[in-house]
Amino acid sequence: FGNTQRAFHASGREKMAQLAARGAIGAIGIGNPVDDKKYPWANGSRKWEMPGMRLVTADGAPVESWPELKATATLSVEGARRLLAGAPMTADEIFERRETGKLQSFDLPGLVTLSGATALERVDSRNVVGKLPGSDAALAGEHIAYTAHLDHIGIGAEVDGDGVYNGAFDNALGIAVMLQAATELKADAAAPRRSLLFVAVTAEERGLLGATHFAQFPTVAKDSLVANINMDMPVFLTEVTDVVPIGIEHSTLEADVQAAAGQLGVGLTPDPKPEEAVFVRSDQYAFVREGIPAVYLDAGIKARNPDVDALALYTDFLTGHYHQPSDETDLPL
């Protein structure tokens, strides 16, 4: 697959749907050494101590729950090696073939027993929506939705005695950027011609839930939503001269984004890490799934100071602070 197609098929949502459609009754995912270097197992596994969440229908039925899958689990690299001991292909052979795209299926000998307990609780969480009416009588009925997610992880497993996951960059900073944009657009004498919606969406960290609900059931007529601009975790660790418009190549917004960047003297840089599948991991994807043109404007990677490597700073943030208690306001901004 190309990067975008791979991102789609790599999403947990799509994997579960495909497995259920093909008759699976359970699924075990395995880690791999390449991802372990970027996101250590100990970091990722902390998230599994937190409850999963699903949207529910009006009658309380869970959305996208795939009841055919009775149990799922994920194993570390070492766990995968133990599971595949004696199999036709070892874990390390699978890891090697993963890098070359030459994986083949085989029957796994043995019996796996999974057990667990589930407690269900209904939780209400709200999106917050503000509206700036358009100034053009012919276009004011069209709406552009600016989004940023208002949630983070909250209280979780302690790291060095700290169990508060603050989410300063992910995504308090994104919310701040959206609110600042709303403030400036409202004060601008040249009022926007189309109506603007500023939507702080909930439960992004639980699977784009707030954005999915808004994109499916917006507060305005759905066919009046003409575009979405999303801001999520802008890693502004140094002054940059560019932005990264993720998903622009799949959107009719490309010419508009290019024109706006040209007016501001800002460069546009392709996604520097397409292997991270960010295209399907943030709120703009909920709008894409509903056929609404959307783009995720991420922080750039070209530092104004030629002695600073902005991409290295971004990579270090992902490795050391992403979804960690250390994502705090004392990081340089």
Annotate each PLM feature.
Residues 1, 30-33, 75-78, 117, ...:
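Active-site-proximal beta-strand/loop segments in catalytic clefts of secreted hydrolases
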Residues 183, 187, 298-333:
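His/Asp/Glu-rich mid-to-C-terminal helical/loop segments that flank catalytic regions of hydrolases
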Residues 8-18, 35, 154, 160-252:
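Acidic/histidine-rich catalytic neighborhood of metal-dependent amide-processing enzymes
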Residues 1-16, 65-73, 80, 115-119, ...:
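Second-shell loop/turn segments in exported
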Residues 61-167, 183-187:
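Soluble metallo-hydrolase cores and metallopeptidase-like ectodomains found primarily
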Residues 1-64, 68, 133, 141, ...:
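Extracellular/luminal Protease-associated
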Residues 54-91, 201-306, 312, 318:
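Metal-dependent peptidase/peptidase-like ectodomains
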Residues 2-4, 31, 37-44, 86, ...:
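Short, solvent-exposed loop/turn and secondary-structure capping segments
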